[in-house]
């Protein structure tokens, strides 16, 4: 079976959940200049074709810099924010206008045998962002640099209802007719908040947020963000992360940070469980809870491959239904990705940890340790003093977590009588 068939099947729940939802996507000017820009446009068109309501916010920093350099003007910044005097504003207007036209042209393509064929998109925009001047800060006059005052929620809503892609540029207008240079990150964040968007998607050069060791941080809650901001300092990643967290605190369900350098990053982030970048969300991504009868089907999907490999003892649906209350599970977006069971042993103060399993895609996130801790917690709550485990493949994992080698003779009689000598499982025990 072709790989894309399985991919489509697994993506179908996401396709359904994204339909008719508003997504605000921010692409900085560096992303528009990158060779991957064409692929990003194709991904946005696909997302629109699948029913998402798209608001695209573009940046223009490198384009402005090149125009300043061409005129022999030196860029001025204060607190990492551009000071936009009158000559600079001319460069801003030139850069933003040219870039907007280039983006609209790319979204208007309808070439045969291309991802754009038959798309026939309508790109809409206008004076949808009202701005105000930042003014004077620490003695520095920002002139025509502004901040978002209001997003025309109703106007954008009507355009989205008409199935247009709304394109917002980093310019805002005042009621007195002035033009202000805005940060595209601020425009995107405010648009996502005011439109009550389902998602804010922020493109950056990096795959997402990287921790101190260079490893991708896949998921964060807003309350975890300040510690990372302190570590990142004044970097652009810090700016993106701060915008993502602010949006979530203000009601946006999920913010995503993905790379504009990686082909397909947006689709991988939105249509797979593992994602591709960093997700910031208020809601709990995963839930460790006790299993219920409705979880039997998911448990079977999780443990069946391990049963077929002989790692776990086979359990029929009937057995799982009967013993479901013994199980604790980790659920992620409706998928059971890990489980473990506790069986108190009759006529003893001991219990057996059984059927500990973690989905292969999630085996490096400490979920096995979380389940072990939950099982030990439950065992202590039942007044058990000893926890046994029987294993054929994972002896070292249990030894590293305080289990000591034991024997069949050490098992309570009620469990020893059921020991399968054909499997020849190793016995370990741990004092609680």
Swiss-Prot record:
UniProt domain N-acetyltransferase: residue ranges: 286-425
Pathway(s) of this molecule: Amino-acid biosynthesis; L-arginine biosynthesis; N(2)-acetyl-L-ornithine from L-glutamate: step 1/4
Annotated Gene Ontology cellular component terms: cytoplasm
Signal peptide interval: none
Protein location: Cytoplasm
InterPro entries: AceGlu_kinase-like_sf, Acyl_CoA_acyltransferase, Asp/Glu/Uridylate_kinase, GNAT_dom, NAGS_kin, NH2A_AcTrfase
Name this protein carries in UniProt: Amino-acid acetyltransferase
